[in-house]
Curated annotation (Swiss-Prot):
This is Zinc transporter 5. Coiled coil: none annotated. Keywords: Cell membrane, Ion transport, Membrane, Signal, Transmembrane, Transmembrane helix, Transport, Zinc, Zinc transport. Pfam families: Zip. Residues 27-49, 103-118, 227-236, 289-299 are extracellular. The gene is ZIP5.
Length: 360
């Protein structure tokens, strides 16, 4: 049942965003601020876009599946040194994606001269990113609280049942009663520890699902941007940058999925959704390229809002759920060498993704 609900939610987000862009493409455009050169070679751009679909798909699959290979290779399992270093790299990638790729895009769209009126003088991009980050915190907090309370109630029922069983022994003597009570108390401690572990597991799963939603929103937008582009130079640059972009983002999401200890079906569904989102976005962009005008006010608002919200989600997730959680982990805190390696990996990941901002 939970898997079905997750699939429906992801499908809803994906198709809602896709249909939103199709609806935008059907609208009239009266702004001539940023049309591409009329002499752009559409045929030249098309070959790059067609090649990008399988290439970006393969890059996404490689990226998201690499951390999931921990089931077969012990060195890739969560809480190993290699996993911490790899996850720090992925966190740097996601942080740079939010700050260097998505947020500037949002600012560019929502501050375009094509948007007339005093209302657009308000810094909507930063405001929307802030609200998205707060909402992500709320989802994180309330979901964790819900699972914590659910496991506390379950542990309490088990403890009450054991006490009733112990009381029903009656004439077994004080020694036997003491033994049963001690035994029940031990089970209570184990139950509490198990409950805390389950709460943390559920929180990790919530983090993975929220992160995937943020990535999907951004991936659809950037995929449609490539698909709708009419310039061969733009398409070529986006093609190359998107391959690395998709691979690195997949690395971060795959690490989060691996820690969530999902079942095989959930892993498959989440991996497929991540991998196909950008290629399908490219296909949608190609389909609407003849009528889509990314300089129309409606298109600018839609892209700006989605980019700003996605940036808020990605920045929050990278700082709070990736970096803060891992860098404060007891294993990291007790190992100076691991801390240095993780910091270097973080800087490399953020640096590489920041460099890619020149092209995508």
């Amino acid at each position: 049942m939970r898997i079905t609900q997750n699939v429906k939610l992801l499908l809803f987000f994906f198709f809602f965003i896709s249909f939103l862009f199709i609806a935008v493409s059907a609208g009239e455009s009266k702004c001539e601020c940023s049309h591409e050169d009329d002499e752009a070679n559409k045929a030249g751009a098309k070959k790059y876009k067609i090649a990008a679909i399988p290439s970006v798909l393969a890059a996404g699959v490689i990226g998201v599946m690499f951390p999931l290979l921990g089931k077969f290779f012990p060195s890739l399992k969560p809480e190993t040194t290699f996993f911490f270093v790899t996850k720090a790299f992925a966190a740097g990638v996601i942080l740079a994606t939010g700050f260097m790729h998505v947020l500037p895009e949002g600012y560019e769209k929502l501050t375009s001269p094509c948007l007339k009126g005093e209302a657009w003088e308000f810094p909507f991009t930063g405001f929307i990113a802030m609200v998205a980050a707060i909402l992500t915190l709320s989802v994180d907090s309330f979901a964790t609280s819900y699972f914590h309370k659910a496991h506390f109630k379950t542990s309490k029922r088990i403890g009450d049942g054991e006490e009733q069983d112990a009381g029903g022994g009656g004439g077994g003597g004080d020694e036997l009663g003491l033994h049963v009570h001690a035994h029940g108390h031990t089970h209570g401690i184990v139950g509490v520890e198990s409950g805390e572990s389950q709460v943390q597991l559920h929180r990790t799963r919530v983090v993975a699902q929220v992160l995937e939603v943020g990535i999907i929103v951004h991936s659809v937008v950037i995929g449609i941007s490539l698909g709708a582009s009419q310039s061969p130079d733009t398409a070529k640059a986006l093609f190359a940058a998107l391959m690395f972009h998709q691979c690195f983002e997949g690395l971060g999401l795959g690490g989060c999925i691996a820690q969530g200890n999902f079942n095989c079906m959930s892993i498959t569904i989440m991996s497929i959704f991540f991998s196909v989102t950008t290629p399908v976005g490219i296909a949608v962009g190609m389909a609407i390229s003849s009528s889509y005008d990314d300089s129309s006010p409606t298109a600018l608002i839609v892209q700006g809002v989605l980019n700003a919200a996605s940036a808020g989600i990605l920045i929050y997730m990278s700082l709070v759920d990736f970096l803060a959680a891992d860098f404060m982990h007891p294993k990291m805190q007790s190992n100076t060498r691991l801390q240095i390696m993780a910091h270097i990996s973080l800087l490399v990941g953020a640096g590489v993704m920041s460099l890619l901002a020149k092209w995508a």
